[in-house]
Amino acid sequence: MRRAPRLAASVVLSLASTVSVCTAQVTDVYRDPRMDFGSIQTVAVVPFANLARDQFVAERVRDVFINRLLSTEAVYVLPVGEVARGIAQLGIQSPSSPTPEDVVKLGAFLKADAVITGVVREYGEVRSGSTTANIISMSIQLIETGTGRIVWSASSTKGGISFWNRLFGGGGQPLNKVTEEAVDALMDKLIG
């Protein structure tokens, strides 16, 4: 008789654990209430800052981000080469963390309504005992080019070692899948 409530409780706990493992956490969302986001038609995505161990990870994550943003068809994303040309011609010293003045100059040069910057904080494999899994932690900022003001910002973390990884082993999802899910969670907050 007592087994039925315990079984039901364990099933509910299992489902809750599965759902929490399958979704990316989006935290620290800022949205400027005065900004008309409908006025943003063209965006430039500058190189992301990289705080992870792998030196090429920022470009990989930026590529996934640009592809996902293009697939929404919500805005026109300037080609990477055009953005790089603008950064070089304007002599922007730190393209991954531009000053408000740099954003205004770059926006005018590229005819972009906004500039997107990003930071990859963690990327790769994490280990706990004999269990490994992939993780990504990143943040994105949308900067309006008329003033150089941040009008939207959010962070996303996806992956890591779950209860199920510890219980059954395994390496979690492939790193590209984890990256896509983290970026998609950010897109839902930005576009949705």
Kindly give the residue locations of the regions a language model identified.
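Bacterial N-terminal signal peptides
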Residues: S10-S20
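C-terminal/domain-edge helix-coil "capping" segments
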Residues: C22-Q41, L106-L110, T132-I135, I143-G192
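Generic short beta-strand segments
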Residues: V119-G124, T157
